[in-house]
């Protein structure tokens, strides 16, 4: 789900890239064998081939100078509280059920037999779309995971595992397979991407890029955005789950992008875009919106109390399906932000909509997206559902 940077790192350090068995990248690397060991000073890393998330998935067991197995880096095979999803293999002839069965075997033959005092370091935590129920912790003892992780139940059959792991998986963001292909086939140097993307543009240069098809991406806070933004801008603030929403909503990974960014955050923005494969940022507006010589749009925002006092309003909830199913405002429309690009036929451009999410970040993204499509009668509910449910 990210461009890993391994090619740049290998080029700059001289280190070799190591892949698990069956991998077929388009560049020089080591295709390791199961149980192959690599020395790092006095330490040893042993590759454990653990197919399931993908056919080549592998974990790395850390062995100290005395020969004690002390930690395991589990990648997307084992998370804290969850396991890797089995539906992301690129161009595989295996079904997700096939891969889930392989994952069951890998967990039970390669990881669960290890000692309980081994520390687990997974590749992702809460908020990632790579699993369904990940913990926000970053490390845990393997023994704790054996006791608490639903997918490591000692009495779990393979059939039960396959059903539970494959049930309720939401479609992956569209950029996932594109990132995987870039990791396999190569990508532009990050230095080149940053140099291209951090060019300070004059207003005229900025307008020229827009005229040639560039997307305006505004990465300020939602509070700053609603007070004034360049028409047709897409808001995705750096202060939220930036990479995930970029990947979900900017459907063309080669889209040319121009930025409205807080001063000093331009390089960070370009870098974070590149991490999910968006390498075609071509500059930022020098001076930001204060230097813009045209009109600025604004978004009306009301409090949850003001919403409660509004009669006959049409509410649009843009939270995820699980959030909606847990609780929602009676008679609200449900339009998950994740899928808003897919179908807007239920929304009428002549109707006024009060838009909310959980806390106020996603609702502003949604409103900016709808305004790009010609919707104008949109009101943001500040504080989102968190504020709504606390009103009298």
Q: Predicted segment positions?
A:
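Active-site metal-binding loops of divalent metal-dependent hydrolases
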Residues: 22-23, 54, 77, 83-84, ...
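Active-site neighborhood of phospho(di)ester-bond hydrolases with catalytic His/Asp-centered motifs
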Residues: 1, 17-22, 49-52, 72-75, ...
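Metallo-beta-lactamase
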Residues: 44, 54-170
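Hydrophobic "anchor" residues on beta-strands that sit immediately upstream
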Residues: 72, 214, 313
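Long, low-complexity segments enriched in small/aliphatic residues
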Residues: 199-208
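Active-site HxH/HxHxD metal-binding segment of metal-dependent hydrolases
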Residues: 1-47, 63, 68-70, 252
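Short, well-ordered beta-to-alpha junction loops that form the rim of enzyme active sites
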Residues: 122-127, 132-133, 178-181, 218-221, ...
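Rhodanese-like catalytic fold shared by cysteine-dependent sulfurtransferases
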Residues: 85-87, 93, 144-181, 185, ...
């Amino acid at each position: 789900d990210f461009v890993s940077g391994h090619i740049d790192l290998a080029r700059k350090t001289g280190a070799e890239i190591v892949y698990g068995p069956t991998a077929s990248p388009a560049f020089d690397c080591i295709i390791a064998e199961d149980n192959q060991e690599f020395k790092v000073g006095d330490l040893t890393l042993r590759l454990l081939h653990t197919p399931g998330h993908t056919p080549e998935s592998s974990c790395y067991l850390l062995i100290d100078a005395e020969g004690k197995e002390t930690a395991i880096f589990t990648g997307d095979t084992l998370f804290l509280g969850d396991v890797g999803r089995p539906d992301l293999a690129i161009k595989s002839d295996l079904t997700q059920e096939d891969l889930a069965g392989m994952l069951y075997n890998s967990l039970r033959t390669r990881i669960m037999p290890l000692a309980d005092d081994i520390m687990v370091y997974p590749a992702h935590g809460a908020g990632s779309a790579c699993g369904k129920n990940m913990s926000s912790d970053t490390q845990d003892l393997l023994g704790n995971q054996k006791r608490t992780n639903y997918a490591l139940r000692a009495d779990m059959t393979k059939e039960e595992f396959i059903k539970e792991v494959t049930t309720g998986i939401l479609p992956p963001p569209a950029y996932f397979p594109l990132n995987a292909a870039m990791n396999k086939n190569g990508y532009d140097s990050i230095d080149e991407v940053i140099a291209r993307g951090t060019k300070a543009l004059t207003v005229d240069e900025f307008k020229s890029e827009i005229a040639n098809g560039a997307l305006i991406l505004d990465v300020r806070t939602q509070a700053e955005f609603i007070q004034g933004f360049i028409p047709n801008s897409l808001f995705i603030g750096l202060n939220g789950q930036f990479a995930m929403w970029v990947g979900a909503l900017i459907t063309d990974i080669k889209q040319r992008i121009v930025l409205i960014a807080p001063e000093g955050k331009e390089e960070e923005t370009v870098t974070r875009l590149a991490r999910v494969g968006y390498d075609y940022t071509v500059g930022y507006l020098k001076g930001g919106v204060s230097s813009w010589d045209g009109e600025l749009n604004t978004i009306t925002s009301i409090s949850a109390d003001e919403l409660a006092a509004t009669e006959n309003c049409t509410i649009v909830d843009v939270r995820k399906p699980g959030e909606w199913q847990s609780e929602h405002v009676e008679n609200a429309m449900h339009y998950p932000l994740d899928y808003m690009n897919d179908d807007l036929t239920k929304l009428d451009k002549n109707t006024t909509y009060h838009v909310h999410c959980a806390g106020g970040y996603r609702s502003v993204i949604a409103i900016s997206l709808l305004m790009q499509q010609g919707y104008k009668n949109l009101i943001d509910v500040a504080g989102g559902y968190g504020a709504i449910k606390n009103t009298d």
